[in-house]
Amino acid sequence: MEPAVSEPMRDQVARTHLTEDTPKVNADIEKVNQNQAKRCTVIGGSGFLGQHMVEQLLARGYAVNVFDIQQGFDNPQVRFFLGDLCSRQDLYPALKGVNTVFHCASPPPSSNNKELFYRVNYIGTKNVIETCKEAGVQKLILTSSASVIFEGVDIKNGTEDLPYAMKPIDYYTETKILQERAVLGANDPEKNFLTTAIRPHGIFGPRDPQLVPILIEAARNGKMKFVIGNGKNLVDFTFVENVVHGHILAAEQLSRDSTLGGKAFHITNDEPIPFWTFLSRILTGLNYEAPKYHIPYWVAYYLALLLSLLVMVISPVIQLQPTFTPMRVALAGTFHYYSCERAKKAMGYQPLVTMDDAMERTVQSFRHLRRVK
């Protein structure tokens, strides 16, 4: 890491001591320290969450590097580094000289590519940890997922003390568990390397490439007719700006003296909503019909399981991507919402955007997907 006080600054300090102008010296040193603390890198900054994070960091006065495998935006305020996070040679220049790294790179959960998840989420993250240490980075903030404790059964107001899932619902979750364990296990205050993990759930908002587009595509294809279960299961959906806010709070509160190091924190909108109510509001906001027929949860789950087995059998010949997998049925038909109390107490977290405002802004941002009646 670059020295906190450069050689010219040391000369200035020496001269100032001779003139007994110590207040100016202290002010200059403090300014240097503040500037260093606000130098960061966003790994995965071209993605959905990453772009929103970069925008909020810039608005708060941070100097931002972006590291990504693809160029997702062009912003002259940002230093962009193109590369593979599994390559230390690619990654090191983007981390050298920064105080904080936000690691939010991951393949989308829907990709279902086991090898890709393992390579990026686990192998890549281990490389991030080692390269951070080599580059002198002091803080590593990981974007994890609340799904690391979800096994397809109800979770109501779940806390971070719940154990990791013994039977993760998909490859994404399986590798996020490995990833989070690696990052939290690397926390080392004695060597001035501090880590924490943010666990959002159901991220949505403007420019979302997954939830809303996939939902609308399913509606257009006539696949959003049925509610799985009774439709009363509460779920956490989290507006992207609230997720970013949680990351930045964690970075700013993380220190040797804080209780954040080596711990995970749930970050949600703190307003659990029935899963099907959320989807219905998005659909009707874009002029699509809400699902109105009900199918028992157990029927949907076993049908999805049977279909998945069939897809596995014929996969050497035909490649199919079923809409409702057992994982998606579990996500759609069970309770899974999480407590933010730890984040509230440790870092003063409160959602910045309410669910009503978040949904309105999201719907307005996808007007191009609106159905014309």
UniProtKB/Swiss-Prot annotation:
The keyword Lipid metabolism applies. It holds the Pfam family 3Beta_HSD. It is found in: Endoplasmic reticulum membrane; Lipid droplet. It is an enzyme of class 1 (oxidoreductase). NAD(+) binds at residue 176. The chain crosses the membrane at residues 298-318. Brain, heart, liver, lung, kidney, skin and placenta. The modification Phosphothreonine is found at residue 22. The active site is at 172 (proton acceptor). GO terms for cellular component: endoplasmic reticulum; endoplasmic reticulum membrane; lipid droplet. SUPFAM superfamilies: NAD(P)-binding Rossmann-fold domains. The modification N-acetylmethionine is found at residue 1. One of its GO terms (molecular function) is 3-beta-hydroxy-Delta5-steroid dehydrogenase (NAD+) activity. Keywords: Acetylation, Cholesterol biosynthesis, Cholesterol metabolism, Disease variant, Endoplasmic reticulum, Ichthyosis, Intellectual disability, Lipid biosynthesis, Lipid droplet, Lipid metabolism, Membrane, NAD, Oxidoreductase, Phosphoprotein, Steroid biosynthesis, Steroid metabolism, Sterol biosynthesis, Sterol metabolism, Transmembrane, Transmembrane helix. It is a single-pass membrane protein. InterPro entries: 3Beta_OHSteriod_DH/Estase, Lipid_A_modif_metabolic_enz, NAD(P)-bd_dom_sf. The keyword Acetylation applies. Belongs to the 3-beta-HSD family. This is Sterol-4-alpha-carboxylate 3-dehydrogenase, decarboxylating. It comes from Homo sapiens. The lineage of its organism: Eukaryota, Metazoa, Chordata, Craniata, Vertebrata.
